[in-house]
Design a protein with these regions (language model features):
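Secondary-structure transition/turn motif
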Residues: 41-56, 88-94
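Conserved acetyl-CoA-binding loop-helix of GNAT-fold acetyltransferases
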Residues: 94-110
Length: 204
């Protein structure tokens, strides 16, 4: 499964696909690697991921529990904090038009199995910032909650502490005003429809 860091180039310009656009032979795969890493991807009926080069629709969104991990550009290890129980985006890629559906599914699953989803804490593209801003300002079905940084700049409790490298790189001292500084939750409406349609394929 080919994965890249969070980068949704063209998200807002593309025609966003919905459940109604899913072909009969296309499914949603969910692969849970021991409760620490989870992948959401387009699959065939057997749960095998589709191919970026051979299939018309392919894509994957991967999320992880907050942890100490190496930054994408080097060997330096940085803690992410508890992030108020939210999962963290680790990588994304999708055929044009098919990314948003996977993203909604990831947020819903992270809400069902945790306290929501937050952007990559260390590296987010300019295009991805627009995506998160869209969730923050345009999606009434998505809720956003502020996270603190690792220095407790906003609140005393440490449970909401979360690495804010991406937000601070983007906005400096105004990091708390950015969509990158928050976690997002969403009712599982899309997942419920997929389950009713028999379109979920789960693997471990």
């Amino acid at each position: 499964m080919k994965l890249i860091m969070e980068n949704w180039r063209g998200y807002l310009a593309e025609a966003m696909k919905t459940l109604e656009d899913l072909p009969d032979d296309l499914y949603i795969g969910i692969m849970d690697e021991g409760g620490e890493n989870v992948h959401f991807y387009y699959s065939d009926e057997e749960g095998n991921d589709t191919d970026f080069y051979d299939d018309p629709v392919s894509g994957a969104v991967s999320i992880t529990r907050p942890q100490t991990r190496k930054q994408a550009w080097g060997d330096k290890e940085e803690p992410e904090g508890d992030c108020a129980g939210a999962w963290v985006i680790s990588s994304t890629e999708a055929t044009k038009g098919w990314g948003p559906l996977l993203y909604d599914i990831a947020i819903e699953w992270a809400t069902e199995n945790g306290e929501g989803l937050t952007p990559d804490r260390f590296a987010v593209s300019t295009d991805a910032v627009k995506v998160w801003d869209y969730y923050l300002t345009k999606r009434s079905d998505v809720s956003a909650d502020q996270l603190d940084d690792l220095e407790n700049s906003l609140t005393e409790p440490e449970e909401d502490n979360c690495a804010q490298d991406s937000a601070k790189d983007y906005a400096g001292d105004n990091w708390a005003d950015t969509p990158l500084s928050k976690k997002y939750t969403k009712p599982p409406t899309t997942l419920a429809q997929l389950r009713k349609m028999g379109k979920i394929r789960e693997r471990s």
